[in-house]
Amino acid sequence: MTRTILIVGATGSIGLHAARRALAAGYRTCALVRDRIRAARLLPTGTTLLVGDATDTPTVANAVEDVDAVVFTHGSHGGEGEAESIDYGIVSTVLGALKNPDVHVSLMTTIGITVHDSLYNRATQAYDWKRRSERLVRRSGHPYTIVRPGWFGHNEPDQRKLVFLQGDTRRVRRSSDGAIARDEIARVLIDAIAIPEAAYTTLELVSERGPEQPDLVSLFAALEHDEPGTHDAILDPDTLPLSAEPPAVLEQLDAIGRVVAPHSSAATSRGFGAS
């Protein structure tokens, strides 16, 4: 049976690659888009276009019906209030609409997400809200893979060997933290859906010189899994303590975490690769 993926942010620079990767892998690939004409021009043939606003609950509920996975490649652009409404709000809306606990969630955020005292974050709160979106995903009970890519497109042409890191230790906030090709980000987000070892993991993604690996199973297998029901990745520094979070954020985190699916056997019980 053909499985269905919904991509949120499909017309962005990563989303376009994600759609191509998903179609090539044989998934029925849906994209939630605001502008049908623009999306039809940009997205590959075979993509099913669902027109609507990703912050609108009825629209999202219709879009996620019968999906097997959701892939988030969306992102804000630094405007006032955008980080909360887009980076966090869209994830919250989609998770709230999902009824099937087995739906896999692939979420793209950013390397350096645990650095909250930078000038950029103080101005936009982007990293605060991206990290809060990660927390929602972890507490939701859904099988998930959270990918924190390095600097998009700063890689050299021969820099295709993927490197998975954990603990968010590259925190300079410059390209020296690591670079990655856009299509490789999409590859990890899409391929993770069918790799049981990828479930319940958080990783930073960069590349180094050398050819890309033929498959990602061994890379995912080497990662530490997040603790069940946790809010932060297993090796993350506690730089955004829950004790200092706004009440509304804590209430939403508590609400989404009331029913947390166990994932001690994530490798076989939930990943698509188990079927």
Model-derived features: positions:
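Glycine-/Pro-rich loop/turn segments that contact NAD(P) or position catalytic residues
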Residues: 76-168
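Short beta-strand/turn micro-motifs composed of small residues
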Residues: 9, 33, 109, 206-207
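Non-catalytic, hydrophobic alpha-helical segments
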Residues: 14, 70, 137, 147, ...
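Mid/C-terminal beta-alpha module of Rossmann-like enzyme folds, strongest
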Residues: 4, 11, 176-177, 182-275
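NAD(P)H-binding glycine-rich loop region in Rossmannoid oxidoreductase-like domains
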Residues: 6, 10, 31-93, 97
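N-terminal Rossmann NAD(P)H-binding glycine-rich loop of SDR-like oxidoreductase domains
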Residues: 3-27
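Nucleotide donor/acceptor-binding cores
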Residues: 2-3, 103
